[in-house]
């Protein structure tokens, strides 16, 4: 679990997302409250439940990006899913319980990787020993007394020399033969609606049939060291302990990001009796968000302390169109602002992996130096903002389209301009985009 303070979390999010301070503060406090709750003694700890968040804002302003970056900072089981993927129980499609099953799978993988990192040093030593045993087979004990001891000393000295060469990478390209555990063959089974759990158990049963068999392979030492380290680390893990920790991690620290929640509001389905009931999906979500117990192949998982963050553009619907019970499960409401011209400018240059830096790095691989003048950046931002206002407002995603169109010619002929410098100023931008951006019909299809 992350131990970062809210200010530190917001500072990290600022490196990748421009503006939206209210949303950043809300998720930062929610994440910090997970840590605070762990410091509270029982039985009060059990009574403290997370305050779920509803993020409201147009597309392309940073809702999904906040969730994506939060996942990296959280150091906790995290899943992002679209609410539109689910159907009411009884209809063809996925039911909402599969959210928790997917989350526990992520947690098991996370926990296994974390536990393997703890034993990796010891596993590497054992893997090196196995490789050295292949390179330097132990001599048979012949002779008595001093001769045998002298032979052992010589063998140990040789092993240490080879171990040093192995660690320095001098033996990486040498090939050896070794016996490795055969990977279990994957098996695809079509899952009937609502029977994903049984299907998973059948798949697991078949995959275990071939486990434990050895396969002789000829590989380079560099690859052999990695394969044997993974194999030795896996032997040191207690699978039951990993499962128990994973379930506990989901129950105490799990985060679910529900995107497109506005698409399952009842208003969107008025008069569409033939469609699958979206209101039914909302009712199915209720117990999950409030707290229930879901049966998974790793055991029962309680959702009482899982944090749910929902988001939606709410263009055609309002948060009040959600059923009242579900509205009450998301007490923290955060509105995200539409992006201004200044925001577009900052997105282009101020973030850690800005679009400008990305394109400069891409063209630098062909020895083309791309320079963006301040007036060129400003003009790009103005065009992106204007096109959003005239046509559909897709937020920051418009910048991808605009800058791709702007650099189309440079990217195409970069190989012919090696060693040259290309300056993108306001005049260059107007030449490349002016006509398209001003013609509404053209910009609707091109930008």
UniProtKB/Swiss-Prot annotation:
One of its GO terms (cellular component) is HslUV protease complex. One of its GO terms (molecular function) is ATP binding. It comes from the Bacteria. Gene3D superfamilies: 1.10.8.60, P-loop containing nucleotide triphosphate hydrolases (3.40.50.300). Belongs to the ClpX chaperone family. HslU subfamily. ATPase subunit of a proteasome-like degradation complex; this subunit has chaperone activity. The binding of ATP and its subsequent hydrolysis by HslU are essential for unfolding of protein substrates subsequently hydrolyzed by HslV. HslU recognizes the N-terminal part of its protein substrates and unfolds these before they are guided to HslV for hydrolysis. A double ring-shaped homohexamer of HslV is capped on each side by a ring-shaped HslU homohexamer. The assembly of the HslU/HslV complex is dependent on binding of ATP. This is ATP-dependent protease ATPase subunit HslU. It comes from Burkholderia vietnamiensis (strain G4 / LMG 22486).
């Amino acid at each position: 679990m992350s131990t970062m303070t809210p200010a530190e979390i917001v500072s990290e999010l600022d490196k990748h997302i421009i503006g939206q301070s209210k949303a950043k503060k809300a998720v930062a406090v929610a994440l910090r409250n997970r840590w605070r709750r762990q410091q509270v003694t029982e039985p009060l700890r059990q009574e403290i439940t997370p305050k779920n968040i509803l993020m409201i804002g147009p597309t392309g302003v940073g809702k999904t990006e906040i969730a994506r970056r939060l996942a990296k900072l959280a150091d906790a089981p995290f899943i992002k899913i679209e609410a539109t993927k689910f159907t009411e129980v009884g209809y063809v499609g996925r039911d909402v319980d599969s959210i928790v099953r997917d989350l526990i799978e992520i947690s098991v993988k996370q926990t296994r990787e974390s536990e393997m990192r703890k034993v990796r040093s010891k596993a590497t030593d054992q893997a090196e020993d196995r490789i050295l045993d292949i390179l330097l087979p132990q001599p048979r004990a012949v002779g008595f007394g001093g001769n045998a001891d002298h032979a052992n000393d010589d063998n140990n000295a040789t092993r240490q020399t080879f171990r040093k060469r192995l660690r320095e990478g001098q033996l990486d390209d040498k090939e050896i033969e070794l016996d490795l555990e055969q990977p279990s063959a994957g098996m695809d089974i079509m899952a009937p609606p609502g029977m994903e759990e049984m299907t998973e158990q059948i798949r697991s049963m078949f995959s275990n049939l071939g486990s434990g068999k050895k396969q002789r392979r000829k590989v380079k030492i560099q690859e052999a060291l990695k394969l044997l380290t993974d194999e030795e680390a896996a032997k040191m893990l207690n699978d039951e302990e990993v499962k128990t920790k994973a379930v506990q991690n989901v129950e105490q620290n799990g985060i679910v990001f529900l995107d497109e929640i506005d698409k399952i509001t009842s208003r969107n389905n008025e008069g569409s009796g033939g469609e699958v009931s979206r209101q039914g999906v909302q009712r199915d979500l209720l117990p999950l968000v409030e707290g229930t117990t879901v049966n998974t192949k790793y055991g029962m998982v309680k959702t009482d302390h899982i944090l749910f963050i929902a988001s939606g553009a709410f263009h055609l619907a309002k948060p009040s169109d959600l059923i009242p019970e579900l509205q009450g499960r998301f007490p923290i409401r955060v509105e995200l602002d539409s992006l201004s011209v200044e925001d577009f400018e900052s997105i282009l240059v101020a973030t850690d992996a800005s679009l400008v830096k990305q394109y400069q790095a891409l063209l630098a691989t062909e020895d083309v130096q791309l320079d963006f003048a301040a007036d060129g950046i400003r003009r790009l931002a103005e065009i992106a903002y204007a096109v959003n206002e005239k046509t559909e407002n897709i937020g920051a995603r418009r910048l991808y389209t605009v800058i791709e169109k702007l650099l189309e010619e440079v990217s195409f002929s970069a190989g012919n301009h090696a060693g040259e410098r290309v300056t993108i100023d306001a005049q260059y931008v107007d030449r490349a985009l002016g006509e398209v951006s001003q013609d509404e019909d053209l910009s609707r299809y091109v930008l």
